C-alpha cells in the first residue's frame, strides 16, 4: 500500500509543477488521466479543484471541494492542496475546519496539531491557539509549546474579543503570569525570549516593581544577559525612580555622548527631581547641575558632536516652557541657536535641528531677525556666490530657516520671483562647482536650492492665481531631476505640482519614477491614487488601482505567515506588533477606498458590450447589502512626514497653539522655580501636533468621501442585482440602501467641510469629497434609484412617467453643468490654472452619465427579454411583498393593496427606459461636441524664453510644454472614446 502511495505521489508531482508555473490546462489533462485510473484519489481531486480555481471556473471547483469536505481527508498532500486552495479563495476559516477534522481522526499527530495551530493563528483565534498549544505540550512536553499557550493567553488579553473588558483582560494576564510563575518555581525557564515574555506580562499588568526586580535578578541576568538598557530606563520612569534614572543616564551619556534620546530622558529626570523636591546623591537635581554636566561633556568630547549642544537647547527650551525668569536662563534662545548654527550649519541636518526650537524664539518677528542675522554673518549678497561647499550648505540652512520664520510670507510677488531667480542661479552654480562626478544614487549638494525655489514659485503662482510661476517651477524640477535622477524630494514635488495643475498623465509618470513598492503603496499611495478616480484617464487609473489591490490582497496572505515564524523562533515580543500591523493593513482606509473606486471604475471605463460588462461584474461582485468595511477599525496609514516642509505655520495654527500654552507658574525672579508643571511637551511636539491636526481634519473629509462612494456603489449595484435576480428580497435591500444613501449624503452635506488650503505646494491636496458635493450626485442618483425601484414594482404608469421625466431632466442638468464648466474655463484669462477644476467637473459629469447608462442598460436588457403577457404571476407576488419588506420610498404613493391587475406591463416599462436612454444618447452626443470644442491650455513662448534666460536646459521648457499639451489632448481623446463606448453599450435600446 505504501509503495502504491509513493507511486501516485510521483505521478502527482508533474501536476503540482504545472499548476505552479501556470500551465493549468496541462494540469487538468494530467489529473483527468489519473482520475480515470483511480477516481477516488483525494489529492488528485483537490488539485483538479485548485486548477479550476486558477482558471476562474469557480462553479466547477466548488462541487469537488464540497465532496472532499464531506470525506474529511487526513492524507498530508491532500491537506496541503486544500490549504493552498482555501488561501487563494480567502477562506482561512475552512483550513481550521479541515485540520480540526483531521486531528479528530488522528488524535496523536504532532504534525496535524502544529498545522491546526498555524491555521488558527492565521485567523487570530487566540483562544483556540491556547487550547491547541496545550494539547501539543501534553503530547510532547517542550518549553516552546508551553510558551505558545502562554503567548496565546496574552494575545487574548491584549487583542482578543475581551481586550476591551478591563476585568477579563486582567484575569487573562494573571493566568499568563501564573503559568510562567509555575515554570519559574520548577526551574524550567530556559531562554531569553521566555524571560522577555514574562517581563511583558508584568508590564501589561502595571506591575513595574516586580518587573524591575526580575530584570535585575539573577535568573534574568542568566537567561537574558543582553537585555537592552531601554527596558531598565522605561521601568525606572514608570516607578518614578528619577534619582536612579538620572544616575544611570549620566553613566550612559559618558559612554555615548551623541545619544539624543538619552539626553532627553536625562533632562526630563532632572525636572522631575525638581518637581518632587528630591536631592538624591550622585544625581543632578537642579538645572545648574544639569547645565554643568552638559558643559563638561562638551569640553571633554574628542570631536564635535551635536548631541550635547542640542541638549543645552533642550534644557533652555524646558526652562522657557516652565516660565523661568529671563535671568535664570542659560542664554537667549536666539543667541543659542545662532551659536548652534555657527558650529553645525555645514551639515544638512542643521536647519531641521533648529526648526525644533524656533517656536521658542518670541515674538515671531524675532525669528526673522535671527534669520537676517545668520544671513548677514555669511558675508554673501545677491551678487556673490558661495566660495566653498561648506559655505553653500550654510547658505541653504539660512534660507530654510528664513522661510520657516515667515520671511517669504511678507514680501511681494515681485520679490518672490527675484528670490526664485537667485536660488535657481545658486543651484546651477552649486551643481557645476560641487555636483559633478557623483554616484547616480547621490543627491546633489545644491539640490536644496532648487527644491526651495520650486516651493517659493508655487506660492507666487497661488498668490497671483496664475500658472506661469508654476510652470517655471516645473521646468526647474525637471532640470533638477535630469541632474539628480534619484532625488525623491524633487520627484514628490513634481508629482504634487502636476496634480495641483490637473496634469494626470504627467503625474502618473512622476509616480512611476518614485518606484513605490510594498508597504509604501499604502503609506504613500494616497499622493497619487486619491486623485485618479475622476482624473480623466480611466484606463490608467484602473491599472494603478489593480496594482495597489494586488499588493493588499497578496500581502495580507504573506503577512498571515509572519506569526508562524515568530512562534517557531520564540520571538514573542514582536507578536503583538505583527497582529497590529496585519490589522492596520487589512483595515487600511486606502485599501477600502481603492476597492470601492475600482468597482465604480470598472463600470465607467468599460468599453465592451453589456454582456461583457456583466461578465466582468459577476467576477468581482459582492453582495451589495453586505458591508465588508469595518468602519470602527478603519486605519489612516498615510505618511505625512514624507514632505520636508519649510513653510511657516498659518495664523490659524498659531492661534490654536496659543490656546494650549500653560499659564505662568509664578516663578517670577526667584533663583529656582518652586513649582514645575507636571506635564511638559517634548521637543518638536508642536510640529507633531500641527501635523496631527491637519491629518485628522483631512481624514474626517476622506472618511466621509469613503462613506459617500461606498453608499453610491452599494445602492447602484443593489439595483443591478435587483434586475438580475428579480426577487423581493433584493428589492427590500435596494430600497434600504437607497434610503441609506440619502441619509449619508445629507449628513455629509450638513457638516460643511472646508477644503484644505492650497497655498503651499506640500500641503495635502483637497479631498475629492468637495467635487461630489459641488455636483448633483445626490439628486441624480436618488431619483435614478426611485425610477428603477418603481420600474421593478410597476405600480402606476403616471408615477413611472413622472420618474422617467425626472431622470431625463437630470441628464439635461448634467449636460448643462458640463457646458457651464467648459464655457467658464474658456472665458478665464489663464486656461492652465483653471484646467484642474474644469477637468474634475467634466469627469464627474461623465461618471454620472456612465453609471446611469450602465444601470438603465441592465433594466432595458431585462425588460426586452420579458414575456409578452401583461403581467407575470411571479411579478404580482413580488408586488404584494415589496411594500411590506421595503423601507418607505418618497417617490411611491401606492400601497400594498395593489394587485396584479394594476401592475404596468413590462413592455410599457421598457418604453419608459428607452425614453431615458434616448435622452442619454442625445446628451452624450452633445457632450462629445463640448469635448471637441474644449481648448487645451498652452504655454506662452515668452515663458520659454524666460526659462532659457535663466541658463536652464532649454529641453526642460519644451518637455514641460509638450507634456501639458499632450496631457490635455490625450484626456479629451480618451473621454470622447469613453462616451462612444457608452453609446455602444446602449446601442440595442436606441
Swiss-Prot record:
<dbReference type="GO" id="GO:0005737">
    <property type="term" value="C:cytoplasm"/>
</dbReference>
<dbReference type="Pfam" id="PF09797">
    <property type="entry name" value="NatB_MDM20"/>
</dbReference>
<comment type="function">
    <text>Non-catalytic subunit of the NatB complex which catalyzes acetylation of the N-terminal methionine residues of proteins beginning with Met-Asp or Met-Glu. Has 2 roles in the larval immune response: required both for the phagocytic degradation of internalized bacteria and for the induction of Defensin in the fat body. Within the phagocytic blood cells, has a role in detection of infection and activation of the humoral immune response.</text>
</comment>
<dbReference type="InterPro" id="IPR019183">
    <property type="entry name" value="NAA25_NatB_aux_su"/>
</dbReference>
<keyword id="KW-0929">Antimicrobial</keyword>
<dbReference type="GO" id="GO:0006955">
    <property type="term" value="P:immune response"/>
</dbReference>
<keyword id="KW-0391">Immunity</keyword>
<dbReference type="GO" id="GO:0010698">
    <property type="term" value="F:acetyltransferase activator activity"/>
</dbReference>
<dbReference type="GO" id="GO:0007010">
    <property type="term" value="P:cytoskeleton organization"/>
</dbReference>
<comment type="subunit">
    <text>Component of the N-terminal acetyltransferase B (NatB) complex.</text>
</comment>
<feature type="region of interest" description="Disordered">
    <location>
        <begin position="645"/>
        <end position="672"/>
    </location>
</feature>
<dbReference type="GO" id="GO:0031416">
    <property type="term" value="C:NatB complex"/>
</dbReference>
<dbReference type="GO" id="GO:0045087">
    <property type="term" value="P:innate immune response"/>
</dbReference>
<feature type="coiled-coil region">
    <location>
        <begin position="964"/>
        <end position="986"/>
    </location>
</feature>
<keyword id="KW-0399">Innate immunity</keyword>
<feature type="repeat" description="TPR">
    <location>
        <begin position="76"/>
        <end position="109"/>
    </location>
</feature>
<feature type="region of interest" description="Disordered">
    <location>
        <begin position="871"/>
        <end position="902"/>
    </location>
</feature>
<keyword id="KW-0175">Coiled coil</keyword>
<dbReference type="GO" id="GO:0006911">
    <property type="term" value="P:phagocytosis, engulfment"/>
</dbReference>
<dbReference type="InterPro" id="IPR011990">
    <property type="entry name" value="TPR-like_helical_dom_sf"/>
</dbReference>
<keyword id="KW-0802">TPR repeat</keyword>
<feature type="compositionally biased region" description="Low complexity">
    <location>
        <begin position="885"/>
        <end position="902"/>
    </location>
</feature>
<keyword id="KW-0458">Lysosome</keyword>
<comment type="similarity">
    <text>Belongs to the MDM20/NAA25 family.</text>
</comment>
<dbReference type="GO" id="GO:0005764">
    <property type="term" value="C:lysosome"/>
</dbReference>
<protein>
    <recommendedName>
        <fullName>Phagocyte signaling-impaired protein</fullName>
    </recommendedName>
</protein>
<feature type="compositionally biased region" description="Basic and acidic residues">
    <location>
        <begin position="656"/>
        <end position="672"/>
    </location>
</feature>
Amino acid at each position: 500500500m505504501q509503495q502504491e502511495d509513493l507511486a501516485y505521489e510521483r505521478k502527482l508531482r508533474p501536476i503540482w509543477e504545472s499548476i505552479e508555473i501556470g500551465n493549468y490546462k496541462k494540469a487538468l489533462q494530467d489529473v483527468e488521466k489519473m482520475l480515470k485510473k483511480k477516481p477516488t484519489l483525494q489529492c488528485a481531486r483537490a488539485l483538479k479543484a485548485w486548477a479550476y480555481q486558477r482558471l476562474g471556473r469557480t462553479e466547477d471547483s466548488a462541487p469537488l471541494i464540497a465532496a472532499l469536505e464531506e470525506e474529511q481527508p487526513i492524507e498530508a498532500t491532500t491537506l496541503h492542496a486544500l490549504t493552498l486552495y482555501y488561501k487563494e479563495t480567502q477562506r482561512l476559516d475552512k483550513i481550521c475546519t479541515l485540520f480540526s477534522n483531521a486531528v479528530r481522526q488522528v488524535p496523536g499527530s504532532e504534525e496535524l496539531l502544529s498545522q491546526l495551530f498555524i491555521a488558527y493563528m492565521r485567523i487570530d483565534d487566540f483562544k483556540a491557539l491556547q487550547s491547541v498549544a496545550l494539547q501539543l505540550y501534553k503530547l510532547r512536553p517542550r518549553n516552546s509549546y508551553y510558551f505558545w499557550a502562554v503567548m496565546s493567553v496574552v494575545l487574548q488579553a491584549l487583542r482578543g474579543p475581551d481586550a476591551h473588558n478591563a476585568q477579563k483582560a486582567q484575569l487573562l494576564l494573571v493566568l499568563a503570569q501564573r503559568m510562567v510563575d509555575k515554570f519559574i518555581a520548577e526551574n524550567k525557564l530556559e531562554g531569553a525570549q521566555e524571560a522577555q515574555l514574562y517581563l511583558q506580562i508584568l508590564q501589561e499588568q502595571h506591575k513595574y516593581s516586580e518587573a524591575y526586580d526580575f530584570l535585575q535578578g539573577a535568573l534574568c541576568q542568566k537567561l537574558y544577559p543582553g537585555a537592552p538598557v531601554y527596558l531598565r530606563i522605561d521601568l525606572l520612569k514608570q516607578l518614578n525612580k528619577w534619582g536612579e534614572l538620572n544616575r544611570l543616564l549620566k553613566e550612559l551619556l559618558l559612554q555615548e555622548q551623541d545619544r539624543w534620546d538619552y539626553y532627553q530622558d536625562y533632562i526630563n529626570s532632572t525636572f522631575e527631581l525638581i518637581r518632587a523636591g528630591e536631592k538624591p546623591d550622585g544625581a543632578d537635581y537642579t538645572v545648574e547641575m544639569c547645565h554643568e554636566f552638559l558643559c563638561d561633556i562638551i569640553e571633554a568630547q574628542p570631536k564635535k558632536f551635536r548631541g550635547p549642544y542640542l541638549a543645552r537647547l533642550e534644557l533652555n527650551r524646558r526652562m522657557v516652557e516652565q516660565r523661568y525668569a529671563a535671568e535664570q536662563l542659560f542664554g537667549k534662545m536666539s543667541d543659542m541657536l545662532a551659536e548652534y548654527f555657527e558650529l553645525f550649519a555645514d551639515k544638512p541636518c542643521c536647519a531641521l535641528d533648529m526648526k525644533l526650537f524656533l517656536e521658542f524664539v518670541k515674538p515671531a518677528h524675532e525669528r526673522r531677525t535671527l534669520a537676517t542675522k545668520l544671513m548677514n554673518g555669511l558675508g554673501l549678497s545677491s551678487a556673490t556666490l558661495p566660495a566653498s561647499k561648506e559655505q553653500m550648505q550654510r547658505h541653504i540652512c539660512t534660507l530654510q530657516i528664513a522661510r520657516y520664520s515667515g520671511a517669504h510670507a511678507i514680501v511681494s510677488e515681485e520679490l518672490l520671483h527675484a528670490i526664485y531667480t537667485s536660488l535657481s542661479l545658486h543651484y546651477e552654480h552649486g551643481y557645476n562647482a560641487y555636483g559633478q562626478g557623483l554616484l547616480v544614487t547621490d543627491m546633489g549638494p545644491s539640490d536644496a536650492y532648487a527644491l526651495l525655489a520650486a516651493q517659493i514659485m508655487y506660492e507666487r503662482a497661488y498668490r497671483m492665481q496664475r500658472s506661469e510661476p508654476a510652470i517655471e517651477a516645473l521646468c526647474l524640477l525637471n532640470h533638477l531631476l535630469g541632474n539628480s535622477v534619484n532625488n525623491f524630494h524633487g520627484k514628490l514635488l513634481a508629482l504634487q505640482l502636476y496634480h495641483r495643475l490637473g496634469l494626470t498623465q504627467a503625474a502618473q509618470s512622476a509616480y512611476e519614477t518614485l518606484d513605490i513598492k510594498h508597504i509604501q503603496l499604502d503609506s504613500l499611495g494616497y499622493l497619487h491614487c486619491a486623485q485618479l478616480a475622476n482624473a480623466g484617464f480611466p484606463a490608467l487609473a484602473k491599472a494603478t488601482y489593480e496594482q495597489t489591490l494586488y499588493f493588499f490582497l497578496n500581502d495580507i496572505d504573506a503577512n498571515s505567515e509572519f506569526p508562524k515564524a515568530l512562534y517557531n523562533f520564540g520571538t514573542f515580543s514582536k507578536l503583538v506588533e505583527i497582529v497590529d500591523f496585519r490589522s492596520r493593513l487589512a483595515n487600511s482606509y486606502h485599501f477600502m477606498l481603492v476597492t470601492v473606486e475600482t468597482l465604480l471604475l470598472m463600470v465607467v471605463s468599460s468599453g465592451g458590450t453589456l454582456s461583457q460588462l456583466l461578465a466582468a461584474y459577476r467576477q468581482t461582485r459582492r453582495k451589495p447589502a453586505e458591508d465588508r468595511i469595518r468602519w470602527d477599525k478603519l486605519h489612516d496609514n498615510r505618511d505625512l512626514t514624507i514632505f520636508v516642509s519649510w513653510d511657516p505655520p498659518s495664523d490659524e495654527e498659531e492661534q490654536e497653539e496659543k490656546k494650549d500654552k500653560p499659564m505662568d507658574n509664578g516663578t517670577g525672579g526667584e533663583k529656582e522655580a518652586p513649582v514645575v508643571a507636571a506635564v511638559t511637551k517634548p521637543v518638536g511636539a508642536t510640529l507633531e501636533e500641527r501635523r496631527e491636526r491637519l491629518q485628522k481634519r483631512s481624514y474626517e473629509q476622506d472618511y466621509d468621501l469613503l462613506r459617500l462612494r461606498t453608499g453610491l456603489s452599494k445602492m447602484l449595484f443593489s439595483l443591478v442585482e435587483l434586475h438580475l435576480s428579480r426577487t423581493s428580497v433584493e428589492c427590500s435591500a435596494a430600497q434600504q440602501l437607497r434610503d441609506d444613501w440619502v441619509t449619508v449624503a445629507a449628513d455629509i452635506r450638513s457638516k460643511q467641510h472646508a477644503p484644505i488650503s492650497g497655498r503651499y505646494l506640500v500641503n495635502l491636496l483637497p479631498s475629492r469629497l468637495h467635487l461630489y458635493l459641488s455636483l448633483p450626485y445626490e439628486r441624480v442618483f436618488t431619483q435614478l434609484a426611485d425610477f428603477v425601484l418603481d420600474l421593478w414594482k410597476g405600480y402606476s404608469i403616471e408615477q413611472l412617467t413622472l420618474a422617467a421625466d425626472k431622470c431625463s431632466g437630470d441628464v439635461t442638468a448634467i449636460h448643462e453643468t458640463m457646458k457651464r464648466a467648459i464655457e467658464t474655463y474658456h472665458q478665464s484669462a489663464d486656461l492652465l490654472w483653471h484646467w484642474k477644476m474644469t477637468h474634475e467637473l467634466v469627469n464627474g459629469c461623465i461618471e454620472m452619465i456612465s453609471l446611469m447608462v450602465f444601470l438603465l442598460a441592465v433594466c432595458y436588457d431585462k425588460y426586452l427579454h420579458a414575456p409578452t403577457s401583461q403581467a407575470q404571476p411571479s411579478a404580482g407576488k413580488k408586488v404584494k411583498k415589496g411594500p411590506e419588506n421595503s423601507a418607505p420610498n418618497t417617490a411611491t404613493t401606492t400601497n400594498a393593496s395593489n394587485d396584479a391587475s394594476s401592475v404596468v406591463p413590462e413592455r410599457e416599462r421598457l418604453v419608459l427606459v428607452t425614453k431615458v436612454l434616448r435622452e442619454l444618447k442625445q446628451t452624450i452626443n452633445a457632450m462629445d461636441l463640448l469635448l471637441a470644442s474644449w481648448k487645451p491650455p498652452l504655454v506662452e513662448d515668452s515663458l520659454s524664453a524666460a526659462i532659457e534666460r535663466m541658463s536652464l536646459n532649454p529641453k526642460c521648457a519644451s518637455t514641460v510644454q509638450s507634456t501639458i499639451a499632450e496631457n490635455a489632448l490625450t484626456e479629451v481623446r480618451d473621454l470622447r472614446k469613453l462616451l462612444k463606448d457608452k453609446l455602444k453599450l446602449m446601442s440595442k435600446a436606441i
